[in-house]
């Protein structure tokens, strides 16, 4: 069984015996325990289990104790460390020297002992040695016997832990390409050096003929298939067939296509993570899967010109339920766009929620909307908006039919109610695919995302000579008047899933206007997650050494390693680029 990645907590202490160290032992170890309790009681792994922490076997005052802690962490699958102290300690003697995992240090803000002095000293050592570390220092002075963690410190500890766990969860997993490059899309030209050096992941690839091989040879669970057919007939609404009359398939042909796309889902899932049932059926090799944390399916055009498309498979892999019940989602990219797949993966690992994959299709200005519909935009839509619409697939969680406190949300699977599953199904239909584009047929996914959800749109791009860069746009989904929605939606493909999105504007740079957001977006796709998580993404990017070229996160929420400030404090974007370039990828 593969261990969860853990956070290692390192209580460091003044090494002077005969009174000084002894007086600090309890307070120092209690700081470590309080941080571990905070993380374990607040954060969860993608499977819903509480995040695990490992505390050093003793306080760390000298190098042998630092070495003992390091050995314990190596055996315990520790993916990041947090050093805590209320006092002065010996900086380079007590620091963790691991260069390939993130580090953070919390220096207690008190007057009796100089925790802040140690924090500054050890961060200077980290900078000198080229091992980045995040500095955490409470805004307000605390009493020496105060065991509470201040709110500002909690926020930084949790932001750091979420991002650090994401690095650990990615390491030693795989991106699985099902097929190759789709229609010349740059993101589906998979770059193995990026995955290996920045994420610690490997790349695997199967030809799309693996789907037909498994279908023809019965390499899937036949009992599950029969159960799935019953569930689909009961719960899935086939939508309006908008094809030309000569392209409309017969009822019998559509029945065969439903069988086909259900098998595609089962095979796609089994390729990613394996299925012990296959071993029972005599297919031991196929049963192990590819250990894929994220995958993509090429589809267009070689597959879709002949076979039913991947929309149903992609939709339900990215959704948190199927005929087997509620479960955690997979991360699965349309058109094998690996860079959007990674963008989805970042979002997923930070939130434990499913991801919307969408084309960043159209910028609608207030003037254009007025001309086409006669409607004057107002509220969050007043400056215009973006039409996010994928060519036929999207997680059903993207409907926004789940709720929290009466508001639409996308939530982790362990919070999802059966009634919310039913609401998602009732508000979605699956029209036959547009056969002018998808000659082999299939079934698209059609819904409208509910408005007023805080969301973050993300995209990772590769820039020759620089490497990966990340862009982030926080904003809100919109609910347009029904007639306005239909008028605009019908101008594209009304058989596809639509999300209306208004980014939050700042009045400067790429966020001067909604048009500027669209104009500066780096690719045709975006990954959309529930919540405003831009600050967490910036922290994660700094750990991986990926510069952020565009974001609308308030400056006070940006949390990067302390040595980033040594690259400059006025132009943070430039400092970020130079820090990432100098330090290089996390796993190189």
Curated annotation (Swiss-Prot):
<dbReference type="GO" id="GO:0042355">
    <property type="term" value="P:L-fucose catabolic process"/>
</dbReference>
<keyword id="KW-0963">Cytoplasm</keyword>
<keyword id="KW-0413">Isomerase</keyword>
<keyword id="KW-0294">Fucose metabolism</keyword>
<protein>
    <recommendedName>
        <fullName>L-fucose isomerase</fullName>
        <ecNumber>5.3.1.25</ecNumber>
    </recommendedName>
</protein>
<dbReference type="InterPro" id="IPR012888">
    <property type="entry name" value="Fucose_iso_N1"/>
</dbReference>
<dbReference type="InterPro" id="IPR038393">
    <property type="entry name" value="Fuc_iso_dom3_sf"/>
</dbReference>
<comment type="pathway">
    <text>Carbohydrate degradation; L-fucose degradation; L-lactaldehyde and glycerone phosphate from L-fucose: step 1/3.</text>
</comment>
<feature type="active site" description="Proton acceptor">
    <location>
        <position position="335"/>
    </location>
</feature>
<keyword id="KW-0119">Carbohydrate metabolism</keyword>
<feature type="binding site">
    <location>
        <position position="335"/>
    </location>
    <ligand>
        <name>Mn(2+)</name>
    </ligand>
</feature>
<dbReference type="GO" id="GO:0008736">
    <property type="term" value="F:L-fucose isomerase activity"/>
</dbReference>
<feature type="binding site">
    <location>
        <position position="359"/>
    </location>
    <ligand>
        <name>Mn(2+)</name>
    </ligand>
</feature>
<keyword id="KW-0479">Metal-binding</keyword>
<dbReference type="InterPro" id="IPR004216">
    <property type="entry name" value="Fuc/Ara_isomerase_C"/>
</dbReference>
<dbReference type="InterPro" id="IPR009015">
    <property type="entry name" value="Fucose_isomerase_N/cen_sf"/>
</dbReference>
<dbReference type="InterPro" id="IPR005763">
    <property type="entry name" value="Fucose_isomerase"/>
</dbReference>
<dbReference type="InterPro" id="IPR038392">
    <property type="entry name" value="Fucose_isomerase_dom2_sf"/>
</dbReference>
<dbReference type="GO" id="GO:0005737">
    <property type="term" value="C:cytoplasm"/>
</dbReference>
<dbReference type="InterPro" id="IPR015888">
    <property type="entry name" value="Fuc_isomerase_C"/>
</dbReference>
<dbReference type="GO" id="GO:0030145">
    <property type="term" value="F:manganese ion binding"/>
</dbReference>
<dbReference type="InterPro" id="IPR012889">
    <property type="entry name" value="Fucose_isomerase_N2"/>
</dbReference>
<dbReference type="Pfam" id="PF07881">
    <property type="entry name" value="Fucose_iso_N1"/>
</dbReference>
<dbReference type="InterPro" id="IPR038391">
    <property type="entry name" value="Fucose_iso_dom1_sf"/>
</dbReference>
<dbReference type="GO" id="GO:0019571">
    <property type="term" value="P:D-arabinose catabolic process"/>
</dbReference>
<feature type="active site" description="Proton acceptor">
    <location>
        <position position="359"/>
    </location>
</feature>
<dbReference type="Pfam" id="PF02952">
    <property type="entry name" value="Fucose_iso_C"/>
</dbReference>
<dbReference type="GO" id="GO:0008790">
    <property type="term" value="F:arabinose isomerase activity"/>
</dbReference>
<comment type="function">
    <text>Converts the aldose L-fucose into the corresponding ketose L-fuculose.</text>
</comment>
<comment type="similarity">
    <text>Belongs to the L-fucose isomerase family.</text>
</comment>
<feature type="binding site">
    <location>
        <position position="525"/>
    </location>
    <ligand>
        <name>Mn(2+)</name>
    </ligand>
</feature>
<keyword id="KW-0464">Manganese</keyword>
<dbReference type="Pfam" id="PF07882">
    <property type="entry name" value="Fucose_iso_N2"/>
</dbReference>
């Amino acid at each position: 069984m593969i261990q969860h990645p853990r956070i290692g907590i390192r209580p460091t202490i003044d090494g002077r015996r005969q009174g000084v160290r002894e007086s600090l032992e309890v307070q120092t170890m209690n700081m470590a325990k309080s941080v571990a309790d905070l993380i374990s009681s607040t954060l969860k792994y993608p499977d819903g289990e509480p995040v695990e922490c490992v505390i050093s076997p003793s306080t760390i005052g000298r190098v042998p104790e630092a070495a003992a802690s390091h050995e314990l962490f190596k055996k315990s699958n520790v993916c990041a460390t947090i050093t805590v102290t209320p006092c002065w300690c010996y900086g380079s003697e007590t620091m963790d020297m691991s260069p390939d995992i993130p580090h953070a240090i919390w220096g207690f803000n008190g007057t009796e002992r100089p925790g802040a002095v140690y924090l500054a000293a050890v961060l200077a050592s980290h900078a000198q040695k080229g091992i980045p570390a995040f500095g955490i220092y409470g805004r307000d002075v605390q009493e020496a016997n105060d065991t509470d963690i201040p709110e500002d410190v909690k926020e930084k500890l949790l932001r750091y832990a979420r991002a650090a766990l994401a690095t650990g969860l990615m390491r030693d997993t795989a991106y699985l390409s099902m097929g190759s490059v789709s229609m010349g899309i740059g993101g589906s030209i998979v770059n193995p050096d990026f995955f290996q050096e920045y994420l610690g992941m490997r790349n695997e690839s199967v030809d799309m003929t693996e789907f037909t091989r498994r279908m023809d040879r019965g390499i899937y669970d036949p009992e599950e298939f029969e159960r799935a057919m019953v569930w689909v007939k009961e719960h899935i609404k086939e939508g309006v067939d908008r094809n030309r009359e000569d392209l409309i398939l017969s009822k019998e042909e559509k029945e065969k296509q439903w069988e086909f796309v259900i098998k595609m889902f089962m095979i796609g899932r089994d390729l990613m993570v394996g299925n012990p049932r296959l071993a029972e059926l005599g297919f031991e090799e196929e049963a192990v899967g590819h250990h894929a944390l994220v995958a993509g399916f090429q589809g267009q055009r070689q597959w879709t010109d002949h076979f039913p498309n991947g929309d149903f498979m992609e939709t339900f892999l990215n959704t948190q339920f199927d005929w087997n019940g509620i479960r955690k989602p997979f991360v699965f990219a349309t058109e094998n766009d690996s860079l959007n797949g990674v963008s989805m993966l970042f979002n997923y690992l930070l939130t434990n929620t499913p991801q919307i994959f969408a084309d960043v299709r159209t910028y609608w200005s207030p003037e254009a909307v007025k001309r086409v519909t006669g409607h004057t935009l107002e509220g969050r839509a007043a400056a215009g908006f973006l039409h996010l619409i994928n060519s036929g697939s999207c997680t059903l969680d993207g409907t926004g039919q789940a709720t929290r406190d009466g508001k639409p949300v996308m939530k982790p699977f362990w919070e999802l109610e059966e009634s919310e599953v039913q609401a998602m199904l009732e508000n979605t239909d699956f029209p036959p695919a547009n056969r002018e584009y998808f000659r082999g047929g299939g079934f698209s996914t059609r819904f409208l995302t509910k408005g007023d959800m805080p969301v973050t749109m993300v995209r990772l791009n590769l820039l020759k000579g620089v490497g990966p860069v990340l862009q982030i746009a926080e904003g809100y989904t919109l609910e347009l008047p029904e007639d306005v929605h239909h008028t605009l939606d019908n101008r594209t493909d009304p058989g596809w899933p639509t999300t209306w999105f208004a980014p939050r504007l700042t009045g400067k740079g790429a966020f001067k206007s909604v048009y500027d957001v669209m104009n500066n977006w780096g690719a045709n796709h975006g990954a959309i997650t529930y919540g405003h998580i831009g600050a967490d993404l910036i922290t994660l990017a700094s750990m991986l050494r990926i510069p952020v070229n565009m974001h609308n996160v308030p400056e006070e929420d940006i949390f990067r390693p302390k040595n980033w400030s040594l690259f400059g404090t006025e132009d943070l974007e430039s400092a970020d680029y130079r820090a990432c370039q100098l330090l290089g990828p996390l796993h190189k």
